[in-house]
């Protein structure tokens, strides 16, 4: 059974109104601060996964930080499609894209309370780099996941040349 029909790389402005609405819901599920999301949307490449009806079912926002480093700014899978390996597939797709773009490192930042996300990234080869304290204290509404208040930001990275050497 095919769950998705394609992964496309698009810009926000290239999306239809319906796809923008579907994507906005996904973006907000990963980062509830819409103003923050809007601050990076113009600068990212959107990797969007569509189902066969052309509905947005998953997204990943990738920012090129400099000539060889990239950051995953946002990753979300529609709730009714979670647990099917789509996030892992998107991450793998993006890692291959970064390699083809001659990138050497991918960063991702997530909350200290995002236990599922921390597990996912580590399963994909990311390693913890450092913690930025109190990043989420300034959010308008406190964020709780699995009963844990999200306060600190955990920074993970994957060094692609090391990944190739170990395979």
What are these regions (language model features)?
Residues 3-80, 91-92:
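Acetyl-CoA-dependent GNAT
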Residues 44-46, 150-155:
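Short hydrophobic/aromatic beta-strand or adjacent loop that forms the aromatic wall/cage
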Residues 77, 83-96, 123:
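Conserved acetyl-CoA-binding loop-helix of GNAT-fold acetyltransferases
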Residues 71, 76, 107-109, 155:
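Conserved beta-strand segments that form the floor/walls of ligand-binding pockets within enzyme
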């Amino acid at each position: 059974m095919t769950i998705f029909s394609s992964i496309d790389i698009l810009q926000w402005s290239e999306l239809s109104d319906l796809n923008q609405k579907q994507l906005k819901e996904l973006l907000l599920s990963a980062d509830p601060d819409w103003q923050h999301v809007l601050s990076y949307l113009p600068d990212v490449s959107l990797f969007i996964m569509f189902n066969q009806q052309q509905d947005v079912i998953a997204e990943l926002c990738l920012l090129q930080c400099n000539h060889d480093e990239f950051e995953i700014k946002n990753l979300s899978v529609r709730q009714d499609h979670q647990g099917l390996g789509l996030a892992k597939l998107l991450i793998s797709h993006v890692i291959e894209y970064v390699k083809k773009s001659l990138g050497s490192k991918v960063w991702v930042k997530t909350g200290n309370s995002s236990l599922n996300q921390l597990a996912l990234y580590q399963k994909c080869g990311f390693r913890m780099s450092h913690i930025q304290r109190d990043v989420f204290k300034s959010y308008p509404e406190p964020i709780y996941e699995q009963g844990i208040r999200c306060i600190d930001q955990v920074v993970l990275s994957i060094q692609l040349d090391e990944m190739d050497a170990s395979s």
